[in-house]
């Protein structure tokens, strides 16, 4: 893990780049960030604030913008963008992720809003509005699926050793089948 894990390397190098950035050595922070991107395929702006315990899994293509904040215990999968929707300097342009958030592969979280603690963002979702704590956002454009149904489903799924963050309320046959199986198991 220490020698061959790009997510770990990117976070280690980001901490150095962030320290340089905050100390006023902007060029050095950007340079370390650039080297990190070249080595890992993960682009984290040196101004981004990333708490301890963040996990970037299969991180190729992850982009985290300058004013983004990522809370403790958050998991980010491949191809995720925490991006901005404005070029305004001095403004909060990138999202804030609370604690223990899961962001699925390919998701785009765009803008200066908050994704609450324990929220989930489904794979390939495009989120442009706040996500409440404990909720799940899925789709393009993202919509919030019922938190109480999601909580019951997640509890049943965890008893089976399965993470159901990608199970949606969509009417497509595969989603209906997955919901039915997990809801049936929940009893």
Name these PLM-found stretches:
Residues 1-37, 152-187:
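Terminal amphipathic alpha-helical/low-complexity segments used for targeting or macromolecular assembly
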Residues 6-7, 12-15, 48, 54, ...:
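Solvent-exposed, flexible loop/coil residues
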Residues 12, 127, 144:
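Short phosphate-engaging motifs
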Residues 40, 45-46, 51-52, 57-66, ...:
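Left-handed beta-helix
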Residues 85, 105-111, 150-151, 167-171:
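Short C-terminal domain-edge/linker segments immediately following a structured domain
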Residues 89:
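Glycine-rich phosphate/ribose-binding loops and adjacent secondary-structure elements
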Residues 135, 140-160:
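Conserved beta-strand-loop-alpha-helix hinge in the C-terminal portion
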């Amino acid at each position: 893990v220490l020698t061959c894990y790009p997510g770990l390397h990117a976070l280690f190098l980001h901490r150095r780049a962030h320290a340089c950035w905050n100390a006023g050595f902007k060029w050095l922070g950007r340079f370390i960030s650039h080297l990190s991107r070249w080595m890992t395929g993960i682009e984290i702006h040196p101004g981004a604030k990333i708490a301890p315990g963040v996990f970037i899994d299969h991180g190729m293509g992850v982009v985290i913008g300058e004013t983004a904040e990522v809370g403790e215990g958050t998991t980010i999968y491949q191809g995720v963008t925490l991006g901005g929707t404005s070029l305004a300097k001095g403004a909060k342009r990138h999202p804030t992720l609370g604690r223990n958030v899961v962001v699925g592969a390919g998701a785009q979280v765009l803008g200066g809003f908050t994704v609450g603690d324990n929220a989930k963002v489904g794979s390939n979702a495009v989120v442009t509005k706040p996500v409440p704590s404990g909720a799940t956002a899925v789709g393009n454009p993202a919509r919030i699926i019922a938190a109480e149904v999601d909580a019951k489903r997640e509890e049943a799924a965890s008893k089976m050793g399965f993470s159901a963050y990608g199970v949606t309320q969509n009417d497509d046959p595969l989603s209906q089948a997955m919901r039915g199986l997990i809801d049936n198991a929940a009893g």
